[in-house]
Amino acid sequence: MKIGIIGAMEEEVTLLRDKIENRQTITIGGSEIYTGQLHGVDVALLKSGIGKVAAAMGATLLLERCQPDVIINTGSAGGLASTLKVGDIVVSDEARYHDADVTAFGYEYGQLPGCPAGFKADEKLVAAAESCIKALDLNAVRGLIVSGDAFINGSVGLAKIRHNFPQAIAVEMEATAIAHVCHNFKVPFVVVRAISDVADQQSHLSFEEFLAVAARQSTLMVENLVQNLARG
């Protein structure tokens, strides 16, 4: 099995990258892909860059160049569920765009023409992630993760997301684009991220302060998930 792992920012991939043995680097289209073994498992780790376009382009390059069997999207996210705090884990059962609106033509809010309203995460990957969470005794929430090309830092943006997606547990800027690409390539995916901030008016300050905490937690989860998947 080869596992593809995607993070947007240097801070979100550096801890994992440093653990990859026999590491080789592919630089293409503004993305970097690091291949090798993580705990004896073949992996391809992508640093995509921030935002939906960068994430989609990077995911496509990763799938074409390295042909992983599954994709794990990792990194940080803003918490929307009331039970979440910095360092907690969110696991996707579905991903949707929060900034797409073609409702004038009868589509659901967040749905693009020719696409499902939401992209479902692979049930086996979700179950494996939840098994790791239990083993590590982490606080976690499973549910809808929404993505858009905006850092949500204020009551107006937050209110809009909560109005359109009251069930959403977290918000970030890449996961749904990655899920979209995986859907088109028919490759199973799951989003496993750690909370760096709770989406409110001070979220930019929290993000800067706690990104390192989120990176450590998400790295811990991904390492354990990779080993879990390799064991079958």
From Swiss-Prot:
Pfam families: PNP_UDP_1 (PF01048). The active site is at residues 12, 197. GO terms for molecular function: adenosylhomocysteine nucleosidase activity; methylthioadenosine nucleosidase activity. It comes from the Bacteria. The keyword Hydrolase applies. Coiled coil: none annotated. Pathway: Amino-acid biosynthesis; L-methionine biosynthesis via salvage pathway; S-methyl-5-thio-alpha-D-ribose 1-phosphate from S-methyl-5'-thioadenosine (hydrolase route): step 1/2. It catalyses: S-adenosyl-L-homocysteine + H2O = S-(5-deoxy-D-ribos-5-yl)-L-homocysteine + adenine; S-methyl-5'-thioadenosine + H2O = 5-(methylsulfanyl)-D-ribose + adenine; 5'-deoxyadenosine + H2O = 5-deoxy-D-ribose + adenine. Substrate binds at residues 78, 152, 173-174. Homodimer. Catalyzes the irreversible cleavage of the glycosidic bond in both 5'-methylthioadenosine (MTA) and S-adenosylhomocysteine (SAH/AdoHcy) to adenine and the corresponding thioribose, 5'-methylthioribose and S-ribosylhomocysteine, respectively. Also cleaves 5'-deoxyadenosine, a toxic by-product of radical S-adenosylmethionine (SAM) enzymes, into 5-deoxyribose and adenine. Thus, is required for in vivo function of the radical SAM enzymes biotin synthase and lipoic acid synthase, that are inhibited by 5'-deoxyadenosine accumulation. Belongs to the PNP/UDP phosphorylase family. MtnN subfamily. This is 5'-methylthioadenosine/S-adenosylhomocysteine nucleosidase. It comes from Klebsiella pneumoniae subsp. pneumoniae (strain ATCC 700721 / MGH 78578). The gene is mtnN.
